[in-house]
Amino acid sequence: MPKGTDRLIIDAPAAIGVARFKTLLKMADAVLLPVLPSAFDRGATGRFISHIESVKPIRKNRKPLGVVANMVRPGTRAGRRLMAFLDDLDYPPVATLRARTLYPELAEDGLGLFDRGDKAAKILQTEWTPLVTFIETLGADLS
């Protein structure tokens, strides 16, 4: 890891196989699994979780699995279905991030959400607090 780096996120492809997952897991302290509110994502997520729950570090909770409900529109049927699905899997989300037009605008400008301090960004930053806390708490547990 580069000097001065406290946290490093490795973005893996959605269709990663169990063998490649195990390789990446050796380098990781935890797994973050973003899930979109769609039937396709729910199906893929259910299958993926059933496969990785047999991997020893996940099964023994030595490498925590944090599910992130991503691009959720509150009050929609799709959002409710996603939350019910995650509840049924016994993986409540560590964070729920809403779908907002600010994200593509930030990407267009080459910025991240925490690069801006305006009201719109601050509102969305609060949604990230549980996820940041999950990651930072994990880091404290590993020290």
Where are these regions (language model features)?
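P-loop/Walker-type NTP enzyme "switch/lid" segment
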Residues: 1-10, 14-18, 26, 107-118
